[in-house]
């Protein structure tokens, strides 16, 4: 007799730190063994079920949806989904259990089962070793609620008492008149994962493997066993029962019906008619002179496709969210593929006119592609929460939630957890973690381990590294997506379980953002963008001080001084083109118009660089190489000089040259994005080549196009995305050029954001001759503000007054009390300030230490003395006076002020630290950033500077870019991979860095190619300078 079996109790690695195998591994192994079906029953979660469904579809092995659950003061059960009703009931049950507990836990109560609908089958995992009467009571309780849908699970794992255990379980089932079924309590796909299963068990219980004892399984039998092995353990009829259960479980995710909310539609309208009405209103606003024939045709095409795909309500919802933000004066802008849409532009969701941008709508929505659109909208980063809470209020927490992100184990984090439970001491764990690359999950080489004092051949180290390698990539927990919202017409917990997020007032669904497309859920991304906060604040400051009310749309376009500033790479603080790599590209590309900015935003990316597209484009732009492309592809290549730089261009080439449909072209884009991880490009190679040859293109051109597509990998940048970002790039550059004080002030008030610290932004402002005034309790507000200059130039220029937000650890509420008290009358002295503003000693000392009392009391030493003498107000002793002791305190030295400035403010308005060290550095023949401007190419030299940034972008093939700052400006340093590996401690740990290397100078771009690094941080004598690393 052939054994047949369906595994009904199996955990994947989405039972965090319990399951030791992925769904893909489990399905592959179950298929190999000849199982009839496989249930994934992760504990009180469906977080991994969509991936299990994908594995099921790929292998052809049926998936049974289920979940293992432990009831509080009740039985342990496995629930299996029989049909759609059962699936909805399971989602609701998990939601109830998760929402009443803190993040990462659940509480399932007996009363949760009192009114459970049908559609769920239950396998009872009875505790027959405990109280017999309690066990019978649990069985009766379950039988009353599940009746003919209850089985007793029989799980045998080669224990010494298996025979007796089987007899006891069968006797229990007989006494309760319920059927029994074989199940495996599977935790791994193969026996070889037992060591990892032991390891993650110890991690979960915060112990070591050596001390875990009975927390670990006695053997490795909780894997997917062969049918022959199962037949040795279980009677045939127990195995056959699993098939009867499996046949009852007919639910698939194709049965889910998802609807977007309808309540935004007024009476007398449908979602289709209301979307058209809003679109026509937007057209009259966006195109006051009327639409062109081509634009009208595009709008009609889009509206027809939106209706055909039943996306009308989705667009209405996004429009509603954007309108709310604008009603609250929150700056926002849609981006990404939505910028391809004329309807999105008309609705005010995006700011890019697709009629002028030649963008490809099929990149956004395609008739052939049965997938929902994905609209990303950026909001001011410090006001996005207002938008998020509006969505929760508008739709209710039952119908709106954020998507999850499955946070996974990475190199050093996995290493630390594994090494700890295997008993390594903390100092060795730290050293091992340091040996891991900061930039990848690959295990350290034997050579690198030796450098850090380890012998790679020792058994314990080999075991630690092997287990770390297995754990890397495993899901560790669910975190929340930065802003992806799922909103539904019906309760979300009938589609997917919902649980509490780590942040208060937020809830998340249990599915990762990448799972949504597979099940057809629509997501709108409510994203945070710091530059929008800075731009809005700049507009407000300009309006306050100049009377001008700028908007993104009203800023003058094609401004020559702005583009000249950009071409000089004078772009510290602006959007997207402020990194060292971008700044190195700017003098070579020399943008002159808006589309040049679109190119600039996109070209310094892994896709164009790895596809060898950057240098050909620059040569053609600089007329060093002929611009060539087939005449039929002029509409595709003319704007990028014959070099494909964008995903949309690849799609257009496939459509025009190889007869792809728009939907097929989008499939090519998706295959292109995923081929390095999953393959899938090979079918397109032959399809493209054959199609292009049939249409008269030569083989070399076809092969070159395909190689460039491969080069894009997963990094191809959408033109629509680049164009949307370029709008903000231009706006920030225009404001930096024409309103530098307001722009810098707004950047600091919006921090943390961007690439540079407030210190670096202020140093840049000073180099641009903007006056910076110190924090002063007599004038400063919480935010930095603008003040008129005292000289006649004041009609055009403004000074920045630093705000109390600059003081480290100073509270905003203290600042607001200071403002309120000062508005009534000026402060007389430290006592008056402390008493009227209600400041405690901590706040008063912070003001003194930072120099904020200099104008009221005097220098830091005197201010600190005065503050120390201020006593809290005591009404009982109001009439008692104490004699004041007069003390003369010395002025702080320049160096003391410098150290105190950085310690309390993170910046200084005094001399730059390097200015104080310049004589000492010059004696050692160190060059300054100013010197480098006049030195010839290939000169070897030494420089020293404060490390203000370290970058290792994916474009750079292991190169680290370091930015040093001295009193004159910045030095760009290139550190090749081998030097970075050899001197990692110096590279990563230095605050003041000496670099010996070779100067490269080309087209106005200067780099120092590092040959040796030295840590000069001790010269700073207590000065702490923070760099912005690896952004």
From Swiss-Prot:
Localization annotation: Cytoplasm
InterPro entries reported for this sequence: DNA_pol3_alpha_NTPase_dom, DNA_pol3_finger, DnaE2, DnaE2/DnaE/PolC, DNAPol_HHH, NA-bd_OB_tRNA, PHP_dom, Pol/His_phosphatase_N
Main location: cytoplasm
GO process terms (BP): DNA repair; DNA replication
Keyword Transferase part of the UniProt annotation: yes
Primary enzyme class: transferase
Enzyme nomenclature, EC number: 2.7.7.7
Record-linked SUPFAM superfamilies: PHP domain-like
One term of GO molecular function: DNA-directed DNA polymerase activity
Catalytic activity annotation: DNA(n) + a 2'-deoxyribonucleoside 5'-triphosphate = DNA(n+1) + diphosphate
A family per Pfam: HHH_6
SMART domains linked to this entry: POLIIIAc
Record bears the keyword Transferase: yes
Keyword tags: Cytoplasm, DNA damage, DNA repair, DNA replication, DNA-directed DNA polymerase, Nucleotidyltransferase, Transferase
Any single GO CC term annotated in Swiss-Prot or TrEMBL for this entry: cytoplasm
Protein family membership: Belongs to the DNA polymerase type-C family. DnaE2 subfamily.
Function: DNA polymerase involved in damage-induced mutagenesis and translesion synthesis (TLS). It is not the major replicative DNA polymerase.
Name this polypeptide is given: Error-prone DNA polymerase
Organism, scientific name: Pseudomonas syringae pv. tomato (strain ATCC BAA-871 / DC3000)
Upper lineage: Bacteria, Pseudomonadati, Pseudomonadota, Gammaproteobacteria, Pseudomonadales
Gene assigned in the entry: dnaE2
